[in-house]
From Swiss-Prot:
Coiled coil: none annotated. This is Large ribosomal subunit protein bL31B. InterPro entries: Ribosomal_bL28/bL31-like_sf, Ribosomal_bL31, Ribosomal_bL31_B, Ribosomal_bL31_sf. GO terms for cellular component: ribonucleoprotein complex; ribosome. The gene is rpmE2. It comes from Photorhabdus laumondii subsp. laumondii (strain DSM 15139 / CIP 105565 / TT01). GO terms for biological process: translation.
Amino acid sequence: MKPDIHPNYRVVVFHDTSANAYFTIGSTIRTERTITLNGEEYPYVTVDVSSESHPFYTGKQKTLSQEGSTARFQKKFGRFIGNK
């Protein structure tokens, strides 16, 4: 294995700013910012969306359409296909 070609893997704190949640995860991301969490200093990265705030994971997602593609097609073009 060649030396100095692999990124530095370390523990990083990700901060979900929309949910104000902190995640301590191993990562190779580069950042100059640091934060002290639980008495230790870690590299710090902010994120807009995480599993704490994404609607899919929180269960607050909206369903846009319940009908299938066939029903939408019939509604749109059914009058043209109707009687032969």
